[in-house]
Every structure is written in structure tokens, then in C-alpha cells.
Swiss-Prot record:
Keywords associated with the record: ATP-binding, Cell inner membrane, Cell membrane, Ion transport, Membrane, Nucleotide-binding, Potassium, Potassium transport, Transmembrane, Transmembrane helix, Transport
GO CC annotation: plasma membrane
InterPro entries according to UniProt: KdpC (IPR003820)
Membership in a protein family: Belongs to the KdpC family.
Membrane topology: Single-pass membrane protein
Protein name stated in the entry: Potassium-transporting ATPase KdpC subunit
GO biological process assignments: potassium ion transmembrane transport
Transmembrane segments: 10-30
An example molecular function term from Gene Ontology annotations: ATP binding
HAMAP family noted in UniProt: KdpC
Amino acid sequence: MKTLFKSLKITLVFCVFFSVFYILILWLFAQVAGPNKGNAEVATLDGKVVGAANVGQMFTKDIYFWGRPSCAGDGYDASSSSGSNKGPTNPEYLAEVEARIDTFLVHHPYLSRKDVPAEMVTASASGLDPNITPQCAYVQVKRVAQARGLTENQVKEIVDQSVEKPLLGIFGTEKINVLKLNIALEENK
């Protein structure tokens, strides 16, 4: 009985610590050291809020760069954030990827199947990835330039300016925030 009470006390202490104090410590750390004090990075265009730069959004028009596909609900539904949990041999998953490849090729007829980046046809683990690699942006330059009536060099220059380097030059890879890139395109009018 003595052991049971000790176990219950320890369990209670850990429950309180991890459900209150640990979360409070993380929140305080984010407020002090985190970007934007731990809050969403709000993106604006013409003084209006158009989204949060740290949450992926669906772009389907040819005048915009597209992000990774989402398996979070019906198109980037943050309340349904999760991966699909479908393995690479799952027939349903393979059919989804094939359909995404076909759709991508319809909008990018100058590409062959082997030129379609895997990242553009497979969903991220969270389903809300806001970033793509520079390679994914460069394969879309021609489509976006044609749809906007710009030269490929003009669009490529905007892409080049949107590349974010790895943290401290070593942590992570180069990436492009799709929302910020599309805002830069809109501001370039």
C-alpha cells in the first residue's frame, strides 16, 4: 500500500509538471527566443492579411507557384493536420500519386515524367508544409511566367530572391516559402 501511494504521488507530480510547468517553460522560451514571439508569421499584401507564412496553403491557379500536396483534410485544413499513413506500396496511395503526376504534367507540358520532383506529388508528414525546394520552384517558372505574361528570367529572379538559406549555413536545406514567393510575384506587378 505504501508503494502504491508513492507511485500515485510521483504520477501526480509528473502529470502536473508535464501538463503545466513544462508547457509554460516552452511558451516562455518561445516568447523570449522564438521568431515572432512564438506566434504565427502573418503575411500581408496591400495591407491585408493573406495568410500565415508558417502554414502551407493551397494554390491551384497557374499564375501562382504551387506548394506540396496536402493530405490534411480538404486542402490544408490545419484542424486535420497529419500524414496519410499510406505506405509506398498501398494501391490507393500509388493511384493518388499517379493522379498528381498527371495533373502536374497537364499544367507543365514541357516536362517529362522523370522531371517531376517527387516533392510536388507526395504530401508532407504534417500535410501543411509551407516550403518547397528551389528545384520545385524552378520547374514551375515557365508555367508561371507564361500565365503572368512575364519572361522566365523575370520570374526566375523573383525565385532566386526568395531562396532561404539553411540556418547558420548548416542546419537544414535551402527552401522557398510558397506564400512569400507568391506575394513577391503579386508585388512585382
